[in-house]
């Protein structure tokens, strides 16, 4: 077996930016079994007195997710937030047109805020700009963030929440460019309502940050024109523009599939260019950052979802079971987000529990980790600090849709406070190991703490509630001498090489 070689230089002064911890965010929508039967299952042996599953809470805490987007998603475009507050017995059952389900409203924003506190996350709250508009948006900010002395803040207090929730980050609707969206709008229609909603929301609470909707994915016919038009209307009043993108391996072409993170990289660069064009056009001193608030692999469950009966409570929708190659692509996508730490400040793995998720649950049964759980956990836990620009020389390959795909996808993160450097690396090679030589000349007296590897001989291998064949091991061979790290990256592997001060 031939071993290819790649080299990399990491230098503590080659800084991209401090990584905003919110890029390791996630998403919970009122969809399928994400809420009901996911985070919330009264009567489950692991449920607390409020019905929240403690086993799920522990798995989420292990991921150290700093921010969670809620309550949607397509769901939010038909959602009346008032339905989910106040006495539970008085809450209406509603038809959710987005997912053709019945919403009981047993869980609403106050219960979700309680749960988010338990897992140590802040909430990225979305407002409904589909069936509703600026009035409901300002009232929701008042209910959540105003201390007291007004109708909606006093209503929150009457509901048992004396202290305001102080939600900092808000989404101005969801995927309004999509014809599937409840209340779909043109770019001009959406740009106008988003601008007016942004103004009144910030008048209620000037400390909040706002995310305006970009395109639902890069293949939308209105992509780029949508962003330019929407930002033209909203630039002075918003802080972020959103990106959404999901990938799948429908053609069963692993080499091409693992190169899709290059498309993600190009998507990010394109949106940065559009935002900066509007900045130049407006002669603005303000820079708009990016919120990649839906990203993941999503394709396994597409056919099964067509067979689900409509108008039931918490049907098993979007329950992708992820395999090993999915974990590798998720790793490449995480590295791509880190590489753009200067502009991507928020990102949400969509979603968190049961719905295209790293965590799965069974009714009255266990919770378990999917293959994609591990790269996400490693990135979140060890990817805090400054992203360093990697100078890489790697052998390359061509695939169906891409040319010059590097076998090595890698980045290093420097945590000055902990005096640690973490190298994240994916070897895309399907046949051979890759010998990595990494020059760490600016890091004196460092040693290898550990070399974590996620590998498997079968790219289609999945985990289940009964067994977890795809799990990382700590038997990587990384060594450091003469300020050079050398490591073997097994074929098709996700690697985390942690360096610390002696």
From Swiss-Prot:
SMART domains: Alpha-L-AF_C. Pathway: Glycan metabolism; L-arabinan degradation. It is an enzyme of class 3 (hydrolase). It is found in: Cytoplasm. Optimum pH is 5.5-6.0. The keyword Hydrolase applies. GO terms for biological process: arabinan catabolic process; L-arabinose metabolic process. Keywords: Carbohydrate metabolism, Cytoplasm, Glycosidase, Hydrolase. The record marks 298, 351 as: Important for substrate recognition. The keyword Cytoplasm applies. The active site is at residues 175, 294. PANTHER family: ALPHA-L-ARABINOFURANOSIDASE C (PTHR43576:SF3), ALPHA-L-ARABINOFURANOSIDASE C-RELATED (PTHR43576). Homohexamer; trimer of dimers. This is Intracellular exo-alpha-(1->5)-L-arabinofuranosidase. It comes from Geobacillus stearothermophilus.
């Amino acid at each position: 077996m031939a071993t290819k070689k790649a080299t990399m230089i990491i230098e503590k002064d080659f800084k991209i930016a401090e990584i905003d911890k919110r890029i390791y965010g996630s998403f919970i929508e009122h969809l399928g079994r994400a809420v009901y039967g996911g985070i919330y299952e009264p009567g489950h042996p692991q449920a607390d007195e409020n019905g929240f599953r403690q086993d799920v809470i522990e798995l989420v805490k292990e991921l150290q997710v700093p921010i969670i987007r809620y309550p949607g998603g397509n769901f939010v475009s038909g959602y009346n937030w008032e339905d989910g507050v106040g006495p539970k017995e008085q809450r209406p059952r509603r038809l959710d047109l987005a997912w053709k389900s019945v919403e009981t409203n047993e869980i609403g924003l106050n219960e979700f805020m309680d749960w988010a506190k338990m897992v140590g996350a802040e909430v990225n709250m979305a407002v409904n700009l589909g069936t509703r508009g600026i009035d409901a948006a300002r009232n929701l900010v008042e209910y959540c963030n105003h201390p007291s002395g007004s109708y909606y803040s006093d209503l929150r207090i009457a509901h048992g929440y004396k202290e305001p929730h102080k939600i900092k980050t808000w989404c101005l609707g969801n995927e309004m460019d999509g014809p599937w969206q409840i209340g779909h709008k043109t770019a001009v229609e959406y740009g106008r309502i988003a601008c007016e909603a942004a103004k009144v929301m910030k008048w209620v609470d000037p400390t909040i940050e706002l995310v305006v909707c970009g395109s639902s994915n890069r293949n939308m016919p209105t992509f780029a024109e949508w962003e330019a038009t929407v930002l033209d209307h909203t630039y002075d009043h918003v802080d972020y523009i959103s990106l959404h993108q999901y990938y799948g391996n429908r053609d069963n072409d692993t080499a091409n599939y693992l190169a899709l993170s290059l498309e993600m990289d190009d998507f990010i660069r394109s949106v940065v260019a559009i935002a900066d064009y509007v900045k130049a056009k407006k002669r603005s001193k303000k820079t708009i950052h990016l919120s990649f608030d839906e990203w993941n692999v999503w394709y396994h469950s597409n056919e099964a979802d067509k067979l689900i009966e409509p108008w039931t409570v918490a049907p098993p929708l979007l329950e992708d079971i992820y395999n090993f190659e999915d974990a590798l692509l998720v790793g490449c996508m995480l590295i791509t987000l880190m590489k753009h730490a200067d502009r991507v400040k928020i990102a949400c793995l969509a979603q968190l529990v049961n719905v295209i998720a790293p965590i799965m649950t069974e009714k009255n049964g266990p919770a378990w980790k999917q293959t994609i759980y591990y790269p996400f956990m490693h990135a979140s836990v060890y990817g805090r600090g400054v992203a360093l620009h990697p100078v890489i020389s790697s052998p390359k390959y061509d695939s169906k849709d891409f040319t010059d795909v590097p076998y090595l996808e890698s980045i290093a993160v420097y945590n000055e406070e902990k005096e640690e450097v973490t190298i994240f690396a994916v070897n895309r090679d399907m046949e051979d190991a890759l010998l990595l030589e990494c020059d760490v000349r600016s890091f004196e007296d460092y040693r290898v703490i550990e070399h974590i590897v996620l590998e498997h001989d079968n790219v289609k291998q999945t985990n289940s509630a009964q067994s977890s064949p795809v799990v990382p091991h700590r038997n990587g061979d990384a060594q450091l001498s003469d300020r050079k790290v050398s490591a073997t990256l097994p074929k098709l592997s996700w690697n985390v090489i942690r360096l610390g001060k002696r």
